[in-house]
């Protein structure tokens, strides 16, 4: 899934994982109430007491319509009264809402809820997550949390659990056993097993890899038909991961309830729109991650919202700084995404906001605000965009008492400083959040002075001792996409040059994986992908010799093993100096590995790393 990239093949199938595959395993977030050290703000559950609260003179968007200058009262986890002129009891804790907008807690309709996803999401007003692929662990605890009204500083999670895919297909590349299907006859038992595990809906993968010049086994039309029929017979939603127009048409014809990615290979036409309208499907475009796949990393949006930067954890900042390999070369296809979103919306097809976090260019929680902005840029008005993250997913996924501000609704609330109903960018100005009626502590942005001091300390570490990476052969290993089910392979040998040691890499890069690669990787410790503090180093000096020009550097860092690598092209035949201060999102205090890879399919090649030094 995504811990690094789960729906990546979906819309992007560019799953860039090397030996980190084991670390990118799709698994649910920590059990409710658990604390973890992978996020600065995770586990902070010192919530305000559940007394009667009144937000007065506030603009209310109830999930469907707008009420100006209203009072909203809530206690014991539920909203009790909403309206103008409602009396406020003396015992109530009163919050002045003048100039502000109260929204229902937001729903992100496509994430991978791994690690501390729930804690990170809620800090930006996302109180419900729809997880599109994770291992079925702790699902009972997750269900208990969302059914109750106990204090929590984590978003509730509804999950697909395992996804339905073919043997060797998308979703099987993460190093964990995934129950696959090979025939329609297996569909009924497969669906029954998922529901027994606790899945809330069924996700079906229709993905042959062609959208990204790859080739993957995928489910037959007959098997997809059988899966949809089995899910519907059990009154369960069936949604589909697609990457192309043809895949989407197949899903619609099979009777799926919704598409959880949009495609960019072509624009929708009359035939597609008519089929979608007749079938009554919904669409989760995942515009944020598609923007990353087609040339727009999440930091571009974040630059317009600098106030949020101080509230982001290191993992979130690092993930936002990334985009998918080769995204710039596909930038022209982004216009198809915008057109398709607008055309589907104009045809009356429900659009749901979903980010596909934590893929490259996205981060839990904060990216929902970028998603809303992209939906508006694609043709939705701000009110419709907000509906896509509140009432619409609540109705279509059967989420019950969420996505609304009415008596009896769950008191999941977000107070915005401004009016996102007129300017959607205002949604990012999250001032206060309530989950189950309890006020959630919100990390306040650092002052600009504090940020400058922090950035300065990182930019000017004490000079570290120079490290020759070629001195210790035990730190090096071959790495290729065959580990992920691809067809590429690599091996390494040590050779002597005139007066030094060099690493010769045999790289056989072949089609058959969304992002083919083969090369070598240096681990900072004797254990692969374990972090070490290199904050005293300022640059990497590297030189490689070999045929071709398609070499790429990848720097792995971050508190969590599944963090996205920082990437940069590498020249051949001359010294390359990589200044770490220019590599946005790199955390030298937790540097894990440095990789050098060939990335274009070709006959077997040999290249040599003649110099590799940290300074």
Sequence positions of predicted segments:
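Beta-rich carbohydrate-recognition modules and glycan-binding surfaces
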Residues: 452-615
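Active-site mouth loops of central-metabolism enzymes
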Residues: 104-114, 171-189, 237
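Divalent metal-dependent hydrolysis catalytic cores, especially in the metallo-beta-lactamase
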Residues: 118-141, 154-162, 199-209, 237, ...
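Acidic, glycine-enriched loop/beta-strand segments at the rims
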Residues: 42-45, 60-71, 84, 363, ...
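Active-site neighborhoods of metal-dependent hydrolases
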Residues: 189-212, 263-378, 450
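Alpha-helix-loop-beta-strand connector modules within alpha/beta enzyme cores
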Residues: 148-156, 160-163, 217-240, 280-285
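Histidine-rich, glycine-flanked metal-binding segment
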Residues: 36-52, 60, 64-103
